[in-house]
Amino acid sequence: MAASSTNARLTNPPRLLSKPRLSPTSVANLRFPAADFSTRFFADSSSPRLRSVPFPVVFSDQRRRRSMEPSNVYVASNSTEMEIGSHDIVKNPSLICAPVMADSIDKMVIETSKAHELGADLVEIRLDWLKDFNPLEDLKTIIKKSPLPTLFTYRPKWEGGQYEGDENERRDVLRLAMELGADYIDVELQVASEFIKSIDGKKPGKFKVIVSSHNYQNTPSVEDLDGLVARIQQTGADIVKIATTAVDIADVARMFHITSKAQVPTIGLVMGERGLMSRILCSKFGGYLTFGTLDSSKVSAPGQPTIKDLLDLYNFRRIGPDTKVYGIIGKPVSHSKSPIVHNQAFKSVDFNGVYVHLLVDNLVSFLQAYSSSDFAGFSCTIPHKEAALQCCDEVDPLAKSIGAVNTILRRKSDGKLLGYNTDCIGSISAIEDGLRSSGDPSSVPSSSSPLASKTVVVIGAGGAGKALAYGAKEKGAKVVIANRTYERALELAEAIGGKALSLTDLDNYHPEDGMVLANTTSMGMQPNVEETPISKDALKHYALVFDAVYTPRITRLLREAEESGAITVSGSEMFVRQAYEQFEIFTGLPAPKELYWQIMSKY
């Protein structure tokens, strides 16, 4: 289904969940009436889904094979619908290759040892980075001293590398590397046929030729990628390597299609932040290897993660064909700590899942591209929370009442998307705990919420703003919505029975002292850390200030609020609470709450 914008909606409206989630910490304390919505949201048995077109998948490299459960991964590429997956699949666990880029062989030797210590499986020696290069001596040195298998790449300028010298000399160096004991060499498709013919009958038994193609503009259609694979195979390549560029995260689905059905070992990577998933999930979708850098400052291609992140953040060695994929959908999204907490939590309970960053421009096209049971659940952040509600087949009454979804679960039985909102309990409980810990006399009696009768000023009318506003209203607070666009503030205020303000009027709004201020916008988030939605002078009228931003932990708003004498509540408090609610939705297991708090205490 085509979609022209982030807010594009699916044809069928969501219905209320027949069995709403009953969390002892959330729904029991936040009962919003759903009756008002029953006339507008109705059950519909149909839902847009991509049809499947099966084809066999075979992996020829039998080293370290392991069984893969039958799976169907639906992906979309241009106008073509396809299915990744088949029965009786076997696959090769993916390797981690560390690019070594230095201007001298001595530095390269040091970096190969570092790669070994960090946990890489092999190193890519980028010869085109060397300044003073003595081929015979330098190749002998690196092959002898590297503690890991070596892949030699001498990338020319015309394929995105540094080398600008004679082409025949370049190929001679690669042949010499083979003769001296290299494990792999990388040769560009443009010259591969001629090169491979020149070494015919001379290849050592263990030696492999990787034939590579790099596209720095986009990711072609599946038909074009299939044709590219065929051309690479025709050269006599032992291993196929294709690297493309992600214009949209849905482009990665086409690369998963290629690696999943490969007849020979294939490296398929999509460059850029939108392509990060291709590098993390290659073990799941049949990729021969992925690249992990020694540190984040030195990458050989855009979007490469570090070896440390692959192993420690994403638990790369635990990812296999049957691993379920979860992720944080947003734009921006790289700042999110969700992968850190969820992946550690998954590992702590031995849950076979991986949680990744998902930079999504268009939510509808993303959900269509990744509509199989392999992609089991998502967290939604700015700007997709409201659109997410319309993309779900069924929605929890709380999320329906709020008008925003921050958690999506794919139901195992039928693949339908179920929408929830954990922002509400996360933010409200954080603010309540802040008020209770202050000993504020207005917080009694203890049997009621400390928000009762408080004036709560909510900055922002998006998904998080809606969740907090509804939660505060249910707790008996007087809610005021302040937003840059007054019309949006008014719309939310009318929906909950509150008041509306333009954000420009916030500094002059102080009908009483002891109010609660809650920022639910991205103002003050990295990298714009000096932004704040309100003047410091106006903060003296607030007893408590909450900021949903948690990167950085202490924003300018919180710093100035503390200096003004207010209680401050960090977005980390909300983040942890909503995150372990999400964990329970994703896994059906009790959340390791102490672990979540322990992890976030470091940030």
From Swiss-Prot:
Presequence extent in this chain: 1-66
Protein's UniProt keywords contain Coiled coil: no
Highest taxon, organism lineage: Eukaryota
Span list, region Shikimate dehydrogenase: 328-558
Chain intervals with Low complexity compositional bias: 13-22
PANTHER family per record: BIFUNCTIONAL 3-DEHYDROQUINATE DEHYDRATASE_SHIKIMATE DEHYDROGENASE, CHLOROPLASTIC, SHIKIMATE DEHYDROGENASE
Name of the protein in its database record: Bifunctional 3-dehydroquinate dehydratase/shikimate dehydrogenase, chloroplastic
Organism: Arabidopsis thaliana (Mouse-ear cress)
